[in-house]
Amino acid sequence: QLGRIIYEMIVLEIDSVKEFMQHMFQGSMFDRFHLRSCEVTTFATFHIDGRCFDDWFDSDEKRTDETGLVTWNMMKTFVFSWIKGNKVPQKMLFDFCHYMPNGDVGSIQIRYEKDKLQFVTGYMQKEFSLEKKGQQAWDDNCLQFIKKHEIVSTQLE
């Protein structure tokens, strides 16, 4: 990822944290996204580096694609086990990504802290360009994604 230019485009404040988390952990909302990293703070801070080590699996169990990253579907049950219970986590950060055919990468960060949940988009270009169509398309797709799942949010400036 070194050398990529990261653009942060939109920040959405999610109105219903509980509803969003149900989509995330019990639904399939993010299942196809790759998980670059995850950090959850409860009584301790837990980290996940999303790199998948295929050598760990048997040959008939190969789990990753060319990205070398795990998918959210592979990890959500594991992460949910850290947070289920009577107390909410102090902090959570999820860094999801989607690889484009042209080599660019769209990202979504989910940031939770102090009862506030934010959905933040980003875009990394494989090569420097003044062209912003890919970034705008990613933004538009993310907004449609939120709308499709009927998530109520407020766009922050």
Regions found by a protein language model. Name each.
Residues 62-116:
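Surface-exposed, low-hydrophobicity interaction/linker segments
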